[in-house]
């Protein structure tokens, strides 16, 4: 949805989903040319190790035996800058000003409520809205952890009505309420624990509902994109007469292609200059900055950012880096904001 709102065509989206880059993003794997940056830990006789911070009391020690997410966020933390930073600039943080107005839903599990994402950093909004618990690591927005919006509202027709007042809503249902959990199925147990029951319906007077049965499709089955695309396309074509009978507006295909091209051509190039770091002391900040540029005023590219990012994560001093790009219209560059989490090992 976000890609379409940014000016991607359906063909553009299929190409992206089938790309080798996308496979790395959702798997957390590092590209071959950056693997050499990573150092291997020296072999030790340890059976396992426990991490804790020396800055905290030993009484508050909480050994971490399990990862917080199945998918390593190392790729996703970085690529969302490349995918979404320029679109955030183009719409000035107002999702109504994207190529197609956009909403997505995230969940504040602490306060037990949905978060309607309609402004701010587009990448953060999308990242939060897709962070299914235990599968993807959540992100922090306004000091709360934000998860997949489907926990509280998996079919937000109410949001679309209230925000956009559409004449017609076309709803696509590709999910269902969780079935009874099975003893040996962890995902079904998690779904039942976290997801609220959803009303997947649209009154005939309000719109058109298309329902798909994907019982054998998993959350990470991106390799089946052609199969799933064809199912969706064929189902839509079979309903096209009824859709056209209710939607009378027509748009020239060449015109929409041109409009997409013009909109995306206005995205400012990712050129970075200033670096702002949170989570490190003065000496550590100086060390981190040197990985990206040698002088304070020198600009660097996204490729430079990518190389420095993987180098920093290779030295076992930093456990995670969460980058954000903030645009400076005065000189057409971006400030690079880095939220850094340092390693504290005790083995």
Where are these regions (language model features)?
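Patatin-like phospholipase
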Residues: 2-321, 325-327, 332, 340-346
């Amino acid at each position: 949805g976000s890609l379409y709102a940014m000016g991607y065509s359906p063909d553009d989206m299929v190409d992206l989903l089938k790309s080798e880059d996308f496979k790395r993003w959702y798997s957390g794997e590092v590209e071959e040319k950056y693997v050499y940056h990573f150092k291997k830990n020296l072999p030790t006789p340890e059976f396992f190790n426990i991490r804790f911070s020396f800055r905290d009391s030993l009484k508050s020690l909480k050994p971490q035996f399990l990862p917080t997410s199945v998918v390593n966020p190392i790729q996703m933390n970085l690529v969302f800058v490349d995918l979404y930073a320029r679109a955030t600039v183009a719409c000035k943080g107002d999702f109504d000003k994207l190529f197609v107005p956009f909403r997505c839903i995230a969940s504040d599990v602490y306060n037990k409520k949905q978060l309607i994402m309609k402004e701010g950093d587009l990448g953060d909004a999308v990242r939060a809205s897709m962070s299914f618990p235990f599968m993807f690591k959540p992100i922090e927005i306004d000091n709360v952890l934000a998860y997949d919006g489907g926990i509280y509202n998996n079919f937000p027709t109410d949001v679309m009505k209230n925000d956009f007042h559409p004449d017609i809503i076309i709803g696509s249902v590709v999910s269902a309420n969780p079935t009874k959990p099975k003893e040996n199925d962890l995902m079904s147990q998690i779904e039942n624990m976290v997801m609220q029951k959803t009303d997947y319906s649209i009154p005939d007077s309000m719109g058109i509902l298309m329902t798909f049965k994907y019982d054998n499709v998993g959350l990470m089955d991106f390799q089946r994109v052609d199969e799933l695309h064809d199912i969706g396309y064929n189902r839509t074509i079979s309903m096209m007469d009824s859709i056209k009978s209710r939607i009378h507006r027509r748009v020239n295909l060449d015109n929409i292609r041109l409009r997409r091209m013009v909109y995306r051509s206005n995205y400012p190039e990712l050129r970075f200059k200033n670096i702002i770091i949170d989570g490190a002391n003065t000496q550590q900040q100086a060390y981190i900055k040197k990985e990206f540029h040698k002088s304070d005023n020198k600009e660097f590219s996204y490729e430079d950012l990518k190389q420095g990012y993987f180098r920093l994560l290779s030295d076992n001093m930093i456990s995670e880096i969460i980058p954000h790009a903030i645009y400076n219209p005065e000189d057409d560059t971006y400030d690079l904001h880095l939220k850094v989490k340092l390693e504290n090992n005790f083995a």
